[in-house]
Amino acid sequence: MYHVYLLSDATGETVERVARAALTQFRDVDIRLRRMGQIRNREDILRALDEVDRAPGIIFYTLVNTELAQFVRNEVEARQLEAVDLITPLLYKLAEFLEMRPQKLPGLQYEMNSEYYRRMEAVDFTVKQDDGQEPRNLHKADIVLIGVSRSSKTPLSMYLAHKGYKVANVPIIQGIDPPGELEEVEPERVVGLIIDTQRLVDIRSARLRNLRQSPRGSYADYRQVEEELSYCRRFYRAHPAWLVIDVTNKSVEESAAEILSRLHGDIRHD
């Protein structure tokens, strides 16, 4: 049996993928991979190399800290072990090409991957909770946006989702009770959106024109819209712990920044 040791200052997933890719070129060989992650200091290195001494094999390592990488090189030479540094030559070449020094942050790639998947999970959640869908999941949302039709609930939800927040949005419709689950959501997670009457009329009229429909119906009628917004304000006043923001003439980015600023410290990621 041949032993291959994989040393990393992060999880070791990257060095293992590289090793496995190379080993596919050598079939019918009995190889044992031993992954050793979270190598952060000299003591960790010495413990790992002591294990290699007991069952000698080749070492592949990825240590972005150049001092630790040099310590490994010195130790394996002194112990007469076989080792391959998979990342330092690459870092030097990139530093030369980009004319800048690399960030020596162990696990940076893993953290970036984790952040990416967290955001994708937030986007997936938010899409499924759009426009009042699946109200049973409201308690799982980091933020719950509520408001009348065309008050920027969906674009705001998606913008926040791409920042990693799980967002649900619920329409407020005069004459129709919101889902009971809304009352069970922690009030500091609920954000009510309000907008100027004429601005909302203009937005709805433009929407109808885009759909090749007449803007003369009640959906874009000034008095009807005014009644909807009055009902919405009364509903918000009945819940004084909710945050209410005016989105009139604000970009999605501006509204999102205001929400995050005013909710700072109250939002948690589950």
UniProtKB/Swiss-Prot annotation:
Keyword Transferase in annotation: yes
Catalytic function, reaction form: N(tele)-phospho-L-histidyl/L-threonyl-[pyruvate, phosphate dikinase] + ADP = N(tele)-phospho-L-histidyl/O-phospho-L-threonyl-[pyruvate, phosphate dikinase] + AMP + H(+); N(tele)-phospho-L-histidyl/O-phospho-L-threonyl-[pyruvate, phosphate dikinase] + phosphate + H(+) = N(tele)-phospho-L-histidyl/L-threonyl-[pyruvate, phosphate dikinase] + diphosphate
UniProt GO MF annotations: ADP binding; ATP binding; phosphotransferase activity, phosphate group as acceptor; protein serine/threonine kinase activity
Keywords, ordered alphabetically: Kinase, Nucleotide-binding, Serine/threonine-protein kinase, Transferase
A family per Pfam: Kinase-PPPase
UniProt keyword Transferase, yes or no: yes
Record EC number: 2.7.11.32, 2.7.4.27
InterPro entries found in the cross-reference section: Kinase-pyrophosphorylase, PPDK_reg
Residues annotated to bind ADP: G147, V148, S149, R150, S151, S152, K153, T154
Domain of life: Bacteria
Family the entry assigns: Belongs to the pyruvate, phosphate/water dikinase regulatory protein family. PDRP subfamily.
Role summary: Bifunctional serine/threonine kinase and phosphorylase involved in the regulation of the pyruvate, phosphate dikinase (PPDK) by catalyzing its phosphorylation/dephosphorylation.
Name the UniProt record assigns to this protein: Putative pyruvate, phosphate dikinase regulatory protein
Organism: Geobacter sp. (strain M21)
Lineage, opening ranks: Bacteria, Pseudomonadati, Thermodesulfobacteriota, Desulfuromonadia, Geobacterales
